[in-house]
Amino acid sequence: MYKRQVYGVKYAPVDYYVALIGVWEQINKRYDNEIPQDIKKICDAYAAGINKYASENPKIVRSEIFPLKGKDVIAGWMYQIPYLYGIEKTLSKLFKKEKPVFSSDIILDDEYNFDPLKIDLIGSNVIGVGPKKSADGFTRLLVNTHQPWSGPTAWYEAHMKSENGLNITGGLFPGSPLVNHGHNDSLGWSFTSNSPDLIDVYELEMNPLNENEYLFDGSWKKLEVEETKIKIKVLGPIKWTINKKIYRSVHGPVLKQEHGTYAIRYSGINDMRTLEQFYRMAKSKNIEEFKNAMSMQALPMYNTGYADKSGNIYYVYNALLPVRDNDYDWRGILPGNTSNTLWTDYIPFKDLPQVTNPDAGYFQNCNANPFLATGFRKDISSFGINETAGIEGHQTNRSLRAIRLYGGDSSITREEFYNYKFDNQYEKNSVMAYAIDRFIEDFKSQDLELLAAVDLLKNWNLRTDLDNRAAALAILTFPLTFDIADYKHDVDHITDR
C-alpha cells in the first residue's frame, strides 16, 4: 500500500520517489538473502506490535495500510536515509522548468539565495569530556541533537531491554524499532548533522536517434526502463491510476526534463543495512565494538561523539565519502559520458577525520568543521580525503564557544559542564560579531539618535541575555550587514580573524 492510495494526490511525489530510487525492487530481490536473521526478527516483531496496536485502536489508524510487514521497516530506512542528507533538494532543483545551478560557490548556488532572518539553522551539539579534564575524574557526554517537535524526524524516547543483551535508552525516529542514539549500560553516543557532498548529478548525452540511449565511454548504452503504476485516491474509494516510466543509467536514477536528461548517484545507494548498524551500535560494550559497528558505513552521514564507562571518548566525522577524481567540479553538474566520473568506491572508515582520547581531554562538534574538534588540528587524523569530499570549512558560533569554554578549562566540574552548555554569548570571531563590526566601521551618519544606537552596538558584550538591549539591536541590524559570503570563510580565516 502506498501513501497516495490512502492520503491522496499530494503524496504522489513521495511514491514516485520510492519507485525512482528502487526501494521495493531492491527489497524484493535481496531482503531474504541479505538481511541477517536477528534483524529480520526485530523487524517482524516491530511490525507485529504496530499491527496489534492498530487492531486494538481501529478508530485512530488508517486500516488501509495494515498489516505491516518486516520488510516495511527496512523500506522506511531506505526511503529516509537519502532524505536526511538532502536528496529532495537535488530532485526539487532538477524538476524546475529551467536548468538548475549546482555550484561549489555558495554565492552562485541558488539554494543559498535566502533571507538571513529566515535561515533554518541546524543546531545540534555533541561534547565529550574525559577524566583528565574533569574535576571529579568522571567522563561526560553531552547529547544535544535538535529535532522538530513532531513529524518523521522527531525523537521519541524509549528504554529497550531484551533477553539477548540489549539494554539501551535514547531517541528514535518514528518507524524505527531501535534506539538511534543514546546510551546502554556501558557507553553512549550522539550525532550532529554534517554536510559532506554525498550526491552527484550527471547530465547525459542522449542519442538523437534513440531517446532511451545515452553516450558512455564512446558507445551508446540503453537506459533501463520500467513502468510503475501510481494509484491515487481521488474521492472515497475512487482511485485514479497514473502510469509513470522509471529510468536508470549506470549512475543511478534518471530524470528526463525539457532542459536535459540527468542521472543521480548518491552515497549508500541501494544499501539496506542501516538498521543492522544501529543494532550493532546498541549492542556494543566497548569502544572497539562500537568502532566495528560504525565501520559498516551503512549510515552515510552524521558527526558522531562517543564516551564510555572506561573513560574513553571518541569523535568521528562519519560520512560515506566517494573516492572521486579530483579533476572535476563535483559540486556542479558532471558529464555523464565518461567512466572517469563514475565512482564505485568509498573512503574507508579508518581514514575519516577522527580522534580517540585526544590530548586536549575533550572533543566537540556543533555542526562545524571536524578538524577543529579539539581546537587543535594536530589531534585529528585522516587519510586520502581531498576537496571533492565537500567537508565543511566553517565554524559555527556554538563550536567556537565550545572550544573557548570546554577547551579553556583544565578542570571542569559537573556544574560547569552544564553551565557551559547553556552559554548564550557570541564569540569575538563569529559571523555575527564580524558582520556587526563591519556595520559599525561602514556606518556614516550625523543623526544623534542613530549614533547613539551605533554606540550601543560598539559596547555590546556579545551576550544575549533577555534584558540585553544591544543584543536585540544587533540581531535586528544583522540582516542589513550580513553577506552570504560570511558563511564561506575557511577554517583559517575564521579562527585567525
What are these regions (language model features)?
Residues 92-109, 328, 447-497:
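A terminal-accessory region detector
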Residues 3-9, 19-24, 188-239, 341-398, ...:
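Gly/Pro-rich active-site capping loops and adjacent beta-alpha segments
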Residues 23, 39-49, 274, 290-293, ...:
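Stable alpha-helical elements in mature extracytoplasmic
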Residues 299-409, 463-464, 478-485, 489-495:
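Hydrophobic alpha-helical segments
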Residues 25-41, 265, 275-281, 385-392, ...:
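Second-shell loop/turn segments in exported
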Residues 377-379, 383-451, 455:
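Terminal end segments
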Residues 3-152, 161-165, 169-178:
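Substrate-recognition/specificity elements adjacent to catalytic centers across diverse enzyme folds
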Residues 121, 160-174, 178, 182-186, ...:
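Glycine- and hydrophobic-rich flexible loops that cap the catalytic core of alpha/beta enzyme folds
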